[in-house]
Amino acid sequence: FFQSMSAMTTVGFNTVDYGAFVLPMLLVTIFLMYVGASPSGTAGGMKITTLTAVIAIMKSRLRNHTRITFFGRAIPYERLYVATSSFIFYTSIIALGTFALSFIENFRFEDLLFEVASALGTVGLSTGITGDLGSLGKLIIIVLMFIGRLGVLTFGLALWAKQQQTDEKKALRDDIAV
């Protein structure tokens, strides 16, 4: 229980050797770092409410409902857009960061994924490979920590906010097949 709270709340208090964890336990810890904690706190991660909103979207879609509800409450579409964007962007950054590290570093994939999830979630836990990463690997971890502390949506807005304003003025309404 203590280790799961440490992973979710970015305490970074490491009392066990995560490098010695078996794969299922490592994956559970990675998931907890990925999700994070409540949006009202300072913990990193994607946030529990974002994951909950995405699950509500999937549940409503599978039941062919047009309104997205959770525990009998309708979730505003604007919040759903933010949650979906955050989920996709956060997952993409973890995937890209892990891919980049696996391309330049010679460690087990799950250890690299753990380091990336910890860095982006600003958790502070490690499987023990951080010190053995090369200069470029450490730079990737530093960039991920910066993005995680800044927030993935804030980072995304910094990259694409100006472009979005001009695109919205030019965009025509259309429908696509999904």
Task: Enumerate the language-model features and the residues they cover.
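Membrane-proximal intracellular helices of multi-pass ion channels
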Residues: 1-178
